[in-house]
Amino acid sequence: MEKFKAAMLLGSVGDALGYRNVCKENSTVGMKIQEELQRSGGLDHLVLSPGEWPVSDNTIMHIATAEALTTDYWCLDDLYREMVRCYVEIVEKLPERRPDPATIEGCAQLKPNNYLLAWHTPFNEKGSGFGAATKAMCIGLRYWKPERLETLIEVSVECGRMTHNHPTGFLGSLCTALFVSFAAQGKPLVQWGRDMLRAVPLAEEYCKKTIRHTAEYQEHWFYFEAKWQFYLEERKISKDSENKAIFPDNYDAEEREKTYRKWSSEGRGGRRGHDAPMIAYDALLAAGNSWTELCHRAMFHGGESAATGTIAGCLFGLLYGLDLVPKGLHQDLEDKEKLEDLGAALYCLSTEEK
């Protein structure tokens, strides 16, 4: 249970650290960000108070997803209606938090008063952003057991496409939910990427079964898989026999910036549903159990660092708990108690069958 609470909490810590960085228009290069951090005394001396270190829309939407998952729903359609209600309720809080534009657009298309079609939104050519990935980690906490894979796939796809009805967007939510479930199962980190890709065809089958936007999906489906396959080959972990990620000899902040931009589809690392989880995963592979190293790689770079920080922080919490993280980063965090309560509730529900 403690690690589930840590996952919810550190996802928000990663968000706050990365969001402060995104808000600083001049801090566009990882090296500068890290130098500034050192001048202020480093991570050990930071205290994340809500006024100085607010969270972004990533945490607000993640809390909304977790709140829906912890209600007493009878069937998945009821869960989706509850998600719609939660998202519509909090959407007015989002504009001041610099949200993923697709999140706002998607929430505007939700229909809480339409019982049958509440969560059915139109296909969105611009719905490929990170926002689906950063609100879905808790789905992996709720359905982490291997025998719940089918439910995890269905819920993460539906949750994702409520706001990001584009394969690059909603496959991001599948990816983060799966990664969290793998962490909860104790699956070796190096296997996560290839096991996630094995689940993508199951998501495609589910989408075909629901007969929504099949033609549009087919046109864009390949991109997410291709980007991830290239990444796994680059790190030499695409095959089952490969169990050690290989990093370049020189992979400092400047080199990472170039690499993150290369993985991106628009030159801003972590902006989309494929590369926000990718940067977080890459950071976890490199950092091991070092929270400081994880922050340098996932929370302090010139891209969409709030998104990558949210995902990386959540996964770190589930893998390693809170003990390796300075207390100042979470003792006064915005919505701390709510996050911990949701983590505890998700743990309890995930051990019961539903």
UniProtKB/Swiss-Prot annotation:
Q: Which InterPro entries match?
A: ADP-ribosylarg_hydro, ADP-ribosylglycohydrolase, Ribosyl_crysJ1, Ribosyl_crysJ1_sf
- What are the GO BP annotations of this UniProt entry? cardiac chamber ballooning; cardiac myofibril assembly; protein de-ADP-ribosylation
Query: What are the disulphide bonds in this sequence?
Result: none
One Pfam family this sequence matches: ADP_ribosyl_GH
Q: Determine if Phosphoprotein is one of this entry's keywords.
A: yes
- A GO molecular function for this record? magnesium ion binding
Provide the function of this protein.
Required for myofibril assembly and outgrowth of the cardiac chambers in the developing heart. Appears to be catalytically inactive, showing no activity against O-acetyl-ADP-ribose.
What do the Gene Ontology cellular component annotations say?
Answer: sarcomere
Residues modified as Phosphoserine? 27
Chief subcellular site? cytoplasm
Q: Which organism is it from?
A: Pongo abelii (Sumatran orangutan)
What does the similarity note say? Belongs to the ADP-ribosylglycohydrolase family.
Keyword set includes Cytoplasm? yes
Q: What is this protein called?
A: Inactive ADP-ribosyltransferase ARH2
Q: Where in the cell is it found?
A: Cytoplasm, Myofibril, Sarcomere
